[in-house]
Amino acid sequence: MTPATRNNDSAVAVADAFDDTGDGPPTAARFAALAACWRQPDDDLQAALAAETDTTVDAQSLRAEYTRLFVGPGPSQSPPYESVYRDGERDADLGPVYGSSTQAVARWYSEYGLQPAASESAPPDHLATELEFAAYLREHEGAETLEQFLTEHPRNWVESFARRVRDADPKPFYRTLLNVTVDTLARADTPL
Amino acid sequence: DDSDTAGDAVTSFLGEDQVVKTACSPNCRGKCPLDVFVRDGQIKKVEQQVPAAKTFKRGCTLGMTHLQRVYNADRLKYPMKRTSWSPDDPQPDQRGADAQFERIAWDDALDLVADGIQRAKREYGPRSLLWHSGSGDGGITGYRRLKELVGGLQDDFTYGIDTNVGQGFNRVTGEGGVFMPPTNTADDWVNAETIIIWGSDIFASQFQMDAEWILDAKRNGAKLVVVDPVYTNTAEKADLWLPIKPGKDTHLALAMMQYIFEHDHYDEAFLRSRTNAPALVRADDGTLLDPASVTATPPEDGIVVFNTETGSPEVVPAETNGPFALFGEWTIDGTTVHTGLTALREQASSYPPQAVADTAGLAAADIETAADWLATRGPGGIMPSYGVGRYLYGHVFGQTYATLLALTGDYGRHGNIHAQHPSYDGSYLETGDWNDPDGAAGVDTYGYNRVLDLLANGDPVQTKFMYGMNSNMLGNQFPERDRWLDAMSNLDTVVWADIYHTPTTRQADIILPAAHWFETEDLLTTYTHPNLSYRTKAHDPLWEARDDYYIMAGLAQRLGHGDKFPDDKHDVLDRFVKNDDRLSWDALRETGTVATDETPTVAYTDEFGTESGRITVYDDDAPVEEGPALPDDGVSLEVPKPLEARTADDWAHADEYPLLFMQKHSKWRIHSQWANVPWLREINTEPQLDIHPKDATRRGIDDGEYVRVHNDRGSVVVRAKYNDGIQPGLVNTDQGWWARDFVDGHLQDLISAETAKVGRTFAFYDCRVEVTRAADEHQSNEYTQHNPRGSSGTATDGDSS
């Protein structure tokens, strides 16, 4: 997001994200690291994972898995956008992108003078963008504000999203990332 | 659950809508101008636009649902390549349902495509490139320009898809091409006294254009006859419905001719002056008597007729009336001759209404009424569509109805009708050399009927690289789908641009996300109404989707033609606007449309386009049709002859596959577009087989059970729907469903890709099947519970087998 910056030190961030298993409120860095992990895998992420795990991560298979799960094409994708899980007219359908919840999220960002970075062509209610915004709130605003945002937005759909992703039988990295993300969002429940 | 209300609470009801002028453009040919309401940068609502030519205000349910096409989560979002594909090791066998893709950058995607084109040309020659574009959109893309510059092969509708009816009509009138022939424009139809809609459900599948004009004519006193095997939305509007058996259309038209001959209801003046009815035909070889045998200096377009006043033959040019015998036989200089009309009457005499009633499943009195109305009530016409040509020898119907209308003199008068979706000639763009650029390498064209051989057998050249757009060819109207899939495995690289991941993009190696129409600036022409439309961009393409123009321009740049594609598409459109005195940006921007020439037009007022300038009710230069169920030496078509393949009662496998299988066009889709719109899928939930309860109960099939529709080519599993509106012996599944919508198999697998020698047209409805209750595993409600309904989708995939 701009003007807030993403944590570019992905190696540190990823390590932090996966190592932070405590019960306390997640740090801004943890939100930021999760956000980085939810983006299209890039060389930084691959390097970070290589540095922190014993096995070498095959960058192409990670990208293919990300594409399969979150970009499509095809029926096994789980579009990582809030409105898709909240604004559909019937439970059986995926909802639209750019629904009313997308607008609500965008309004949160603009309240704080933020908007998704120009390089992000995805709708503003992408899970990664919401996590980046959570990182910003964690760092710059009070706990109640963060709580309100998490309750109004990511917590409202991350379970539905997670169910759909799990149905698509994700590979370990994304299965873990999903668990950590769900857990992180729940943990932040504890007042700071 | 507060999540339902949270969204509503934040929707702003303040602020102003921006109304963006744009237009729809699938292949219903409607090209309806639309108003798109945009608020906070997002599209909120779509309405019909009142265009400059106001009486042509149009729009349908599909157009109103674009919101769910633009914001569909299932859209193609980024350029992608199949992970198992690489230029050096394309692994075409890895395509299909299990193929994995990875997102790539646009620059990389365009590099791969351009390099692939260069490489194929270099290694296999320019004709190893195959360009394919269907009818999915009508905007300015630069596709044709780039293709002409780069060269290669292109496939085309001609011949192959829906080229029968027009072809037969053209053969005897010299007018039109292979598609619907010219007709009086729709605003003249109100003058018709009798309208016969023949094999077309225009109140369901093209209602945005033609239906209102038909109703106007009815209100003005016209009799409406509908010939259709199915009790359709259109049939229910009819004064007389002829529920014909499939494939018997030529029989019916001949029976009408027989009635008209018997009752002397033919238009003598028209036949003498504008047809070759009086032309003298040699009895020995069926050719026309040579004018040079009658006069030393015959006029170029002259025919020999018999003048009953002088008692001798004479040569007359086109558009000439006189005391010419319409019937009779003479011996002239030892040669026995008769008139062309004599031969036609002789042919019609074998098809009296009483006999045809039996063959075609009709009442003789109804046939006579239809013929009587057409011949005696005043000007009228026949409005067929492509459906009636979807039989192997369907072109004969084109010849037949052209001939029938010649008998009744229904050409060149107010109130005559010859086709649906009439042409207004004014909606064109002054494109200059845009589609025919300097330095063009040129492309060779192959009809779809030849492309399967081209791909499968390298006959006559082996194609290696295919670029496709605006088309879901593997989802719709390409029969024997398995053969296409096999044939395409000979291609090293398949590149496809689309808005959605269709059953066709699934077979691609490189997928390019195209912009939705509302995300483009464009100029749209049409022939179905006298308006030219401007598309204003409602917002930028979502994700990384691109207007096809910019895809073409990106490729052009890499292929050495960058200077021929302006960086900004607007500059191209600007060129067309500046070329054209009728157009101005102010008007286009403000109103969205410019009215073009909307004068009602009467067609066929001049000499016909045949050699003689006359309709050849006797075609002395007739082709000999060859194909299944015809005699080995073929059938020569001087006069209309009912030819049938699989619809014939004595077809070799009629006992094994007793049911005829049709794939009607649906009101819920235009071909396969809109199949993924949730609002529409709420109503039109899944593919079904329309089957008469008699046929179903005979097979132990309950209403709503899943059935396997099968023949020796393939099968498809769909839900049976008891339908009293479909005649026993005929079943129907609407076309345009996507592979994933079928429980198992695919509609296209059942249809033969075989074409006849003359017709050269896929015969979608010339198909026989048997229907049995599907296996128990398909009877559970699991399918419907997980029915994809458009945007989601985890159902069994029709591609997996």
From Swiss-Prot, chain A:
Q: Which organism is it from?
A: Halobacterium salinarum (strain ATCC 700922 / JCM 11081 / NRC-1)
Described by its record, this protein's role is as follows: May be involved in the biogenesis/assembly of dimethyl sulfoxide (DMSO) reductase.
In terms of superkingdom, the source organism counts as Archaea
Does the record carry Transmembrane helix as a key word? no
Which keywords annotate this record? Chaperone
Family recorded in the similarity comment: Belongs to the TorD/DmsD family.
Q: What is this protein called?
A: Putative dimethyl sulfoxide reductase chaperone
Please summarize what the entry says happens upon disruption of the gene.
Answer: Cells lacking this gene fail to grow under anaerobic conditions using either DMSO or TMAO as terminal electron acceptors.
* Induction annotation: By anaerobic conditions. Its expression is under the control of DmsR.
Show the InterPro entries listed in the entry: DMSO/NO3_reduct_chaperone, TorD-like_sf, TorD/DmsD_chaperones
